């Protein structure tokens, strides 16, 4: 359950290490984001020479959450950390590599490029 002010690890090679959620997209009163949901965030920690700098406002998609997520078959999935992948304006990932596993829900939400770059889809 990602909400405003939540901090997430960045799971790609854009140069950002941590982002802070500004807004959950998808409706005016939407409070929480789960796996596959898009957020607006600001970069809180970045490495020198990366594609993004500290203070940049970016869009990102949530790929891992600590809060368990219920699937249609009745099973639950949860991860050890909250993580996101930074997106371009057209919805494609800004980085060229994805680190760590991602949820299968991304395939249903049409983030096929992220699914294909990820080392593991759970």
Swiss-Prot record:
UniProt-listed InterPro entries: Ribosomal_uL14, Ribosomal_uL14_bac-type, Ribosomal_uL14_CS, Ribosomal_uL14_sf
Coiled-coil stretches noted in the UniProt entry, renumbered to this chain: none
Keyword hit for RNA-binding: yes
One annotated GO molecular function: large ribosomal subunit rRNA binding
UniProt KW keywords: Ribonucleoprotein, Ribosomal protein, RNA-binding, rRNA-binding
PROSITE patterns (alphabetical): RIBOSOMAL_L14
SMART domains the record matches: Ribosomal_L14
GO BP field: translation
Pfam families for this protein: Ribosomal_L14
GO cellular component: cytosolic large ribosomal subunit
Record NCBIfam families: rplN_bact (TIGR01067)
Quaternary structure (record): Part of the 50S ribosomal subunit. Forms a cluster with proteins L3 and L19. In the 70S ribosome, L14 and L19 interact and together make contacts with the 16S rRNA in bridges B5 and B8.
Function according to Swiss-Prot or TrEMBL: Binds to 23S rRNA. Forms part of two intersubunit bridges in the 70S ribosome.
Family in the record: Belongs to the universal ribosomal protein uL14 family.
Protein's UniProt name: Large ribosomal subunit protein uL14
């Amino acid at each position: 359950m990602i909400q405003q002010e939540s901090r997430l690890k960045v799971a790609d090679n854009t140069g950002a290490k941590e982002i802070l959620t500004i807004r959950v997209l998808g409706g005016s009163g939407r409070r929480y984001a789960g796996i596959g949901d898009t957020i607006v965030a600001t970069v809180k920690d970045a490495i020198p020479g990366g594609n993004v700098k500290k203070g940049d406002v970016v869009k990102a998609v949530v790929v891992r959450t600590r809060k368990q997520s219920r699937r249609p078959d009745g099973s639950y999935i949860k991860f050890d950390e909250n993580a996101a992948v930074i997106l371009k304006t057209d919805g494609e990932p800004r980085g060229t590599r994805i680190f760590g596993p991602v949820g299968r829900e991304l395939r249903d939400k049409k983030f096929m490029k992220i699914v294909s770059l990820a080392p593991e889809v759970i």
